[in-house]
């Protein structure tokens, strides 16, 4: 858990974007949906890492569903705080108590962020997918061209159903057939809650024993059923076939990411069976090292049929149909994947005995103990069927796509007439008329394209070709250590090699799923209490998405930057004001709601927001206007009158004065000492000084063997420090540096003795004080007052006052009286920078103490 995450490419993108003064609306769009932009490039793709910068975990015992919902919730809360100035997290369990944000609104927004091709449980994978290896500058034009081809093809694929709507509706008018003849048992598995499943033909309910099942993602129209690690679903009266009986079983199947079995190895397990795990009599469908196998067994291996087929994806939904003609021969077994016949290899064809067994039909395992049941844990199922005949190839082709649509049309005859959304809206007076949901539309489109695949296949081929070109351009840049696990030494080497540009960078990005985005409203916010399904939508009390914008993150970005959106520009300019003046025009910059603070100058906030938007979202122009204003340039001196009437400077009666942020304090100290390394822009994170043994308790991750970097990289700006969420940098945390467990729009500013102690004892600040003292001694060899003013100019940007000079001169005499060679040697040994041995150590230590005092002053710490 909380292992190293390779995402410095996103940080570098942000730096470049501000330096280039990228229009802020484009900056927002790239971060929310850079992967979906048809005119995007590598920078835009990297920018989408903003969405991926949330929590992840590889911790054993993690409940995947809980982690997944926490991940989506964190993204939605971050979006609300960053772009809306709203506490969306208050609507997780119920409607917002103060703001007009309903629980439906919250989960509708969450739907935008839950449709990425990722897994929440990472297994401590350094290359948490989706990710992108960054190519070299020389290859950028070719890479951007390939990326553009992929984005355009993916956009065309998403729009293909709408483009072909007339043909789809005409095809629906022909009445797709349902495969019902010989249907013995049908498990739609659409209950969406509870531990019982219903067989639709006979209406019988079957209870799940052991762990309750999980109801989650689905490939078509309904919620799917997933077995947990110890779920047992047994159906004693289903699937009891003999070797001379023809039968078929089919269903949507989704294997979990990784399955490991101590006896049978990794990625092996039973999908569905009616077989005793002890004597192995019966039939079963299972995977061995992800390869699909179908078996009918009387006695293994001398009296059995066994065929092997395709390798199945992990994870990924596939529709499988297995038919057997009752011939007793392997040639009588047919397997279809997504409606297409699968090439099979016969590995046994000697069946002569009975395959009947008293063992029940089992999902995800065979009957028997765990040691013999070969379970395929965390396997998803939907629409599982059993027939008393061998289906034809044409029928098998209809099962994955046409049959669900035919079922809908059979139950809802109005759907055909209402397939056109405009007609559906016009027909609201008809109690049966309604608009198709995104998944119903997708199912109809899938059914049509399964029969007319030419256009879709061409787009899929273009996507694959573009991806191949992208991979070829970045293959030589891929950091090899990402394949090598969690060895701390390898991680250290990777960071060092990347800094020296010996290897490339890998960064987390977004990649949208092909399926429509959705979410479930959760009762009381509990991940197990799924309620109504909702689709991407903006809050009901705000203007809707712009017409024609897609229901995904790209549409959300268009809404955020729309001139009709009353929040975004105000929230952004308020944060810019906060950065310069210390406090925003709305003090609660993360909460513009009822509970938040009212604007101190509402007309000014409105003016700045409109001005910012109408001048091309030009951030540098706005900053320039603010810093050149009379409000910013006035004196920060606090008079008694201002103290009484405006103690918190809410009315901007004086210039800004506030303590700098943690990173600024560290960087200012290093800059004053001449140590700050500004030679290189961007690059990987580095490991700064931390107290010895701080990470020794973090066992089993690539951070447990912490070793700080050495040489010039150790003195880079604080924005490049490697941060660990569960173990923040102590020298930054003491100055209210954030832990990055959640998005933070406004930092606290506290004043405790720990801050002074850190400045007097932390290695970074002591080393900076030593270097500044050495610089002062060399630059001003004799005059003590001039030397003190030299250090003040470096730290305070002004000469010392008479009172300050007298205090430091007095401190100098005290230090001289107390210092000796032994003590000086210990004090000067701090840090890695070698000192000039020609300087008297006692003198050096005295001036190091004076430099430290200046660093610890309010004048040095406050802006």
Q: What role is predicted for each listed range?
A:
Residues 1-39, 100, 145-170, 420-713, ...:
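Primarily short, surface-exposed interaction patches in extracytoplasmic proteins
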Residues 1-4, 29-30, 37-44, 60-64, ...:
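Short, solvent-exposed loop/turn and secondary-structure capping segments
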Residues 15, 36-144, 732, 744:
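Sequence context surrounding c-type heme c attachment/ligation sites in exported
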Residues 124-156, 404-418:
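Charged, amphipathic alpha-helical linkers/stalks
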Residues 155-479, 483, 489-494, 501, ...:
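Extracellular glycan-associated modules
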Residues 722-725, 733-743:
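A structural supersecondary motif
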Residues 850:
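Short, surface-exposed polybasic-aromatic patches that bind anionic ligands, especially phosphate groups
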